[in-house]
Each structure stands twice: as C-alpha cells, then as structure tokens.
Design a protein with these regions (language model features):
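Context-gated lysine
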Residues: 22, 54, 133, 188-189
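Long, charge-rich C-terminal accessory regions
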Residues: 125-152, 156-158
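Intrinsically disordered, low-complexity segments enriched in small/polar residues
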Residues: 5, 15, 24, 132, ...
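Short Cys/His-rich micro-motifs in 6-15 aa windows
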Residues: 116-127
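Helical subdomain adjoining the active site within ATP-dependent kinase catalytic cores
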Residues: 7-118
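Forkhead-associated
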Residues: 145-195
Length: 195
C-alpha cells in the first residue's frame, strides 16, 4: 500500500485522472454551459455549423441543468424530430462534398458559401410547412423547413414529415417526388403517399 503524507493524491488539482471519465460521470460542466465556463473551449468548429437553435436548447437542457438532475433532461421523444429537422436544413457542397446549414453566411464572402471551401451554395429548393391557428391564420414560424439542392436531371424525394406531424414510424416515407430536367420541374405524389 502506498501512502503519501502530503495529502490525498485524488485532491490534487493537476492529477493524471482521465478527464473523459470525469466528463462521462457528470463531474465537469458541458463545454457550452451557460452558467459555468470551467470546461469551455475555444477550439473546434463554431456551434452555428453544428447545431440548430432546437438542438442547442436540447443539449443545454441535457448537459446544463440535466447534468446533475436527470429529471430536468428532455426525454428521448424530442431528439429524433430535432435531429431530422437539422438534417433537413443541410445542403451538400458541390466543391468539397461537406454538409452545412443552407442559411450559413460565410464571414469572408458575406454570402451563402461553403464554410469549408468557400464554394457558392448550389441552387436549393426550400419547402416550408406551417401549423395553423384557426382556419386562415398560420403561426408565424414554419413548423418544418426542408431544403435540398436540385441538380439538373435529379429526383428529389420529399418525406412525409414535411407535410404531416413527425412520427418515428413513417416520417421518412416518400410523400412527394420532384424531378428536374430539360423540360422543367415535375412534382408528383409518391406511390407510397397517403391518400
């Protein structure tokens, strides 16, 4: 048995303990914790390239107050929809094949250019669906935004979640097919769409 008379080695500030283990145990604050910047980082990608507002709120609830109080964490129910919404707002760069949010403005070009290689964003189709308050008043923000680039001669599959409530079992089911060609753009209902 080893004994150190200077004190307990586990209490030393610069011990060699695994910082990742401490993080997994909830002993360190989240890197973006709004109330504790002890574990913050200036390195890595900007959060605006990684997280939507909805994902940011979920992460903050999970790893902020929820880090030490599990009952404050959002349930698993909220994550699939937030992740699908984030994925539906990304485009693929034709220059480097990286993905990024369609509304990103590159700080150097002050335009919609890829954050990784500055290639201009391709032309995109933006579909927005709204929930309604009464029969003739839409709520202010769209409940879903679906963004995809449309290269000539391609077919785009629009999933059911754009038009209907998000359901885990069928949110990816093709509802509408959009194809682009020399003669124009064709929009048709999928064979798998609801009647």
């Amino acid at each position: 048995v080893l004994f150190r008379s200077e004190g307990d080695w586990a209490d030393e500030e610069n011990d060699d303990g695994d910082i990742e283990d401490k993080a997994y145990a909830g002993l360190l604050p989240w890197v973006d914790d709004q109330n504790d910047d002890a574990n913050s980082s200036d390195s890595g990608l900007p959060r605006s390239l990684l997280l939507t507002a909805k994902l940011t709120a979920l992460f903050e609830s999970t790893f902020g107050p929820g880090r030490t109080s599990p009952l404050l964490r959002p349930t698993i129910y909220h994550w699939p929809e937030a992740l699908a919404q984030a994925a539906d707002m990304t485009v693929t760069c034709p220059g480097c094949s990286m993905h990024y949010y369609y509304d990103f403005i590159h700080p150097e070009t002050e335009a919609h250019h890829c954050p990784y290689c500055t290639t201009p964003r391709p032309q995109v189709l933006i579909l927005e669906s709204y929930r309604w308050k009464g029969t003739d008043t839409p709520l202010e923000l769209p409940c879903w935004r679906y963004v995809r680039e449309i290269p000539p001669g391609s077919e785009l599959t629009v999933p059911r979640r754009v038009f209907d409530e998000f359901l885990m079992l069928d949110s990816d089911t093709a509802e509408v097919l959009i194809s682009s060609g020399d003669e124009g753009i064709l929009i048709k209902k999928s064979d798998h769409a609801r009647s």
